[in-house]
């Protein structure tokens, strides 16, 4: 039962992709399709002024984003719990 439902869903997705591909004449079809599916332009890098969780940092320079702190031991940004 689960396998037949999975195959039916996969078939519908494949039908949607093939139908959309037949209408699209642009060469950038895969990028366009992915950006429409996820509704985010993931192919253009987004820069931010602070470093997030797990990014390397230098202790004492305050490079990490708000609610994060640079670990003296590991030298990467971690979540600051307020202690």
Swiss-Prot record:
Disulfide cross-links: 50-65, 57-70, 64-77
Propeptide, residue positions: 22-48
Entries under PROSITE patterns matching the protein: HWTX_1 (PS60021)
Leucine amide modified-residue sites: 81
Main localization of the protein described in the UniProt heading: secreted
Subunit composition and interactions: Monomer.
Role summary: Lethal neurotoxin. Selectively blocks tetrodotoxin-sensitive voltage-gated sodium channels (Nav). Does not affect tetrodotoxin-resistant voltage-gated sodium channels or calcium channels.
Name assigned to this protein: Mu-theraphotoxin-Hhn2j 1
Organism: Cyriopagopus hainanus (Chinese bird spider)
């Amino acid at each position: 039962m689960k396998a037949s439902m999975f195959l039916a869903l996969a078939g519908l997705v494949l039908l949607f992709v093939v139908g959309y591909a037949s209408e699209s004449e642009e060469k950038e079809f895969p990028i366009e399709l992915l950006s429409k599916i996820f509704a985010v332009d993931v192919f253009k890098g987004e820069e931010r002024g602070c470093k997030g969780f797990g990014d390397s940092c230098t202790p004492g320079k305050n490079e990490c984003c708000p609610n994060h702190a640079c670990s003296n031991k590991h030298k990467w940004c971690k979540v600051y719990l307020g202690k």
